Amino acid sequence: PDLLLDHLFVHFYFGAVLPMNVPQETASPPENISGIRQLTGFWLWVPRVATVVMTLITIDYLFNLQLIGFITQVESQFFYMVVALMLPLVYVLWPMNKHASRTQVPWYDVLLFLATAGICGFFVYNAEQILDRGWEYEAPQYAMVVSFMLWATIVEAVRRAGGLPIAIIVGIASLYPIFADLVPGPIQGFPSSPTQTAIYHAMSRESIMGIPLQAFANLVIGFL
């Protein structure tokens, strides 16, 4: 999932900011490269605005300007904000399947876009509580439900952007903590419940918020 976010930002940055300087006759249609939709009107500006907002937030975070400290003061909150700005766009840019429209955003993708934005927004809003109250180990019931929802939306986003085989690999790998006691010796471990696994994926620094996302948010965006 973290590598997916890396791919998305590079696409948004170079697809939303730089094409204005590229001659039309030399630019390849995006759908021929990655199967994305040809957005028009309002939806065309959604990834562009998200890219600009992420750039400004990253500048504030990397240079410790504290101009928008309510987002960048807590590191995990900044990471959740990166996810919140990128993950929902998958449902706008990548169709559900090959038969779906490549020029219009259907109603179900609009709902998924809004739902994913709301799910990610929940973690942005509660990032400080997650740290202070140790939700990674004992989260309230409603946070457990939202953790399952984030888990599901990420696997579906991987399927759309990376294909079904990669989604299957990611999905099976994400279930590992549940069956850790059943795998061969070298990778065997103590099992976790599905609820603990969902919380682990959503709130720990070892899964969605792991090293790939941290390196991406701290280094890759700044470099670009």
Which positions does each model-derived feature cover?
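Short linear sequence motifs
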Residues: D2-H7, M54, Q73, A84, ...
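Conserved, well-structured core domains of diverse proteins
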Residues: G15-E138, M144-F148
